[in-house]
Regions:
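Catalytic active-site module of serine/aspartate enzymes centered on a nucleophile-bearing elbow/loop
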Residues: 166-194
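Acidic catalytic loop of the alpha/beta-hydrolase fold
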Residues: 149-154
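Conserved acidic catalytic loop of the alpha/beta-hydrolase fold
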Residues: 1-11
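Hydrophobic, aromatic-rich cap/lid helix
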Residues: 99-132
């Protein structure tokens, strides 16, 4: 409907993390409207991981009179830079490949979480229950599966690329600086133009 409203017949689709699952479904259901597909950091979980993530990763949160939701949102964002998954706070799950961003950056992400506080969990739950192993082989459009070297979901790249016919894969550099972001943009542009 969005594409129809904007009078866009077809276009390239990009989806990152949860959005990668959404973009893959658009490509499956409307291949005539998707020129090429880019999946950035698609999560590919085992059944055991899915169950654990559904139970712990994205709890339903509501504002309360003491503002505990504000502290929760800060910790939810901050802890993702320290652990993966963020709810497993052990040395085994510590993310050594990333450094803690400045508080101003964390604050921007927290504000985004707060905008969708009462519904944010629905997108995560949809991604965690997505039947990706069954659905991804149905993608017929040319697809690039990628992730940044510091992305905790990068293990999904190989798994997704194996399932999707007509796919290529690659890894982007660390996105924490402008050079890394520029390289990522160039890699995606080259795929889309190729």
């Amino acid at each position: 409907r969005v594409m129809d409203s904007l009078e866009i017949e077809s276009c390239h689709f990009f989806g990152s993390h949860t959005g990668a699952h959404i973009a893959s479904e658009v490509a499956i259901k409307h291949p005539d409207r998707v020129k090429k597909l880019v999946l950035d950091g698609i999560a590919m979980f085992s059944d055991e991981e899915r169950k654990e993530y559904l139970e712990h990763y994205a709890p339903e949160i509501k504002p309360d009179e003491f503002g505990q939701h504000l502290v929760w949102a800060w910790n939810f964002v901050r802890d993702q830079f320290i652990y993966f998954p963020y709810f497993k706070k052990t040395s085994e799950h510590q993310r050594d490949e990333v450094s803690m961003p400045p508080p101003e950056f964390i604050n921007k992400l927290v504000l985004e979480v707060l905008k969708g506080l009462t519904t944010y969990h629905k997108g995560y739950h949809a991604a965690f229950t997505h039947k990706d192993k069954e659905r991804l082989p149905m993608i017929t459009v040319e697809t690039f599966c990628g992730a940044s070297e510091d992305d905790p979901l990068k293990s999904g790249v190989d798994k997704a690329a194996e399932l999707i016919p007509n796919s290529t894969k690659g890894f982007f550099p660390n996105e924490s600086n402008e050079e890394g972001l520029g390289t990522k943009a160039s890699m995606i542009r080259d795929f889309l133009k190729g």
